[in-house]
Amino acid sequence: MANKHFDVVVVGGGPGGYVGAIRAAQLGYKVAIIERAKMGGVCLNWGCIPSKALIANAELMEKLAEQEEWGITTGEVKFNWKKVIGRSRDVAAKLNKGVEYLMKKNKIEFINLHAKIVKAGPKIEIELRDCDLQEELTPSPVKVNKVKETITCGKVIIATGAVARDLPFAKFDGDKIWGAREAMNNTDRPEKLIIVGAGAIGMEFGYVYKNFGTEVTIIEMLDRLVPVEDEQVGKEMTKIYKKHGFNIKVKTGVLDVDSSGKGVKVTVAPMGKDGKPDTSKKEVLEADKVLLAIGVGGRYDGLFDDSLGLETVRGHIKTDYVPLSDTTPSEPKPLDYKTNLPGVYAIGDVIGPPWLAHVAAEEAVLCVERFAFKEGKAKHDPIPMDYTVIPGCTYCHPQVGSVGYTEQALKAQGLKKGEDYDVGVFNNGALGKAIATRHTDGFVKIIRGLPRGEILGTHILGDQATELIAEMTLARRLEATTEEIIATVHAHPTMHEAVHEAALASEGRVINS
């Protein structure tokens, strides 16, 4: 019997994969999507969406803890942790079914098997196998069984995402040494939790567990929380988290994790001037669990036959995409997202930072539209993505929303404040809506270029920051100036007024501060 043949096969059913599959189907290709777990990928099932459900619960707990200040009395506040976790799992399940429906609607064949590419183009061969997948564990270990069938295609898009990194001396064990999946699915809340890494994952889970009564310690090797953000944001966030009762250890390295006893013992030491932990000052921290949130690498192990010679770079699949550097300004350019193998493309987390779901989805669309245009199936060449106009969001409280360059990145490029750029900052404590809603932590910071006033970067710390950043993302995409932000009437009273005031501040004419 002849193998099934498709025009396009997408491997990976996350926000990059399923969006790319839909766009290919819209353009007239015969499409299949291979996902060995559940449709929606990590984002929908184990990341972005269920974590926001947990954060919504934590926000409610935070409000209830402040009930006296709101003039409300409810009596003793109790919670059922299993139901809290269960609600987040229900949210994920509902959306998972929604993505499966989208595949049927767009006549995309969903193949729920493990894929291995054994032959590159022009006629790509993909072996399909059953597998035993422990989806609830980090890093989702899998046992692959014998080949069930083989399919062929003209093009394949790899959208397999990323896998969490561990430490040489601390491997995920599904019990005491956690990744995000264990933190999201654990029905026995720990009394003490140590989090290694102060990026989005560490900050968000820290916020959740702290508001449900867990004693949380966050360890970060650099000098501030959310270290990829603007330095001013990170330092202010560090102060705020300390104020709210988190145990914060910045400029601290982890030397060892001992999980042999009842709980975990984490040996740490302050970072020395040589960039290494000073072992003469080490101390041991104890907790019930430790969550490793130290970054990710591309997930492609076992996906390609070794004989194909797939090129990789720094733990990711190599394409014509090159991640941004703080020291190198970037101009948007057309990308094909092609690998070194004929007919094989790759998008999303598997090709490198910034490891964001919305970037993966956009890359998938651009990848498909680019080859479709070359084949006469799309009416125009797609507008390339500007990787300096990507909003980044962290959903702890206060939230962080950012787009464009940080001030430290501009300094690394040799730009000088007052000569090449200027900065405007407006604190939420001076904003009527923030005072009325008890959300006075944080600020809006706008960096404008000189002499024209174009938006180089915007960094928001505070309530609704992840929503407010959309305005400034569009402003940067359209090459708007602070003068145009100022000339745009912002409704009163809103948190958006802080954006308007920060634009005014960047020109030295702030009104309400």
Please identify what each model-predicted range represents.
Residues T187-E229, L356:
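Rossmann-like NAD(P)H-binding beta-loop-alpha module
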Residues C153-K155, A159-R165, A287-Y300, V350:
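Glycine-/small-residue-rich beta->alpha transition segments that form the dinucleotide
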Residues A2-F6, I22-Y29, I34-R189, L222-V226, ...:
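Glycine-rich flavin
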Residues L324-P354, R452:
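Short FAD-binding loop at a beta-strand-to-alpha-helix junction that anchors the flavin cofactor
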Residues G12, A159-T160, A180, V196, ...:
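Short, well-ordered coil/turn residues at beta-beta hairpins
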Residues A2-G14, R189-G199:
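Beta1/beta-strand and adjacent pyrophosphate-binding region of the FAD-binding site
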Residues V9-G16, G20, A25-A37, I49, ...:
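Flexible, glycine-rich terminal cap/loop adjacent to redox cofactors
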Residues E229-D230, L341, I347-A409, H492-S513:
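A conserved FAD-binding loop/helix module that cradles the flavin
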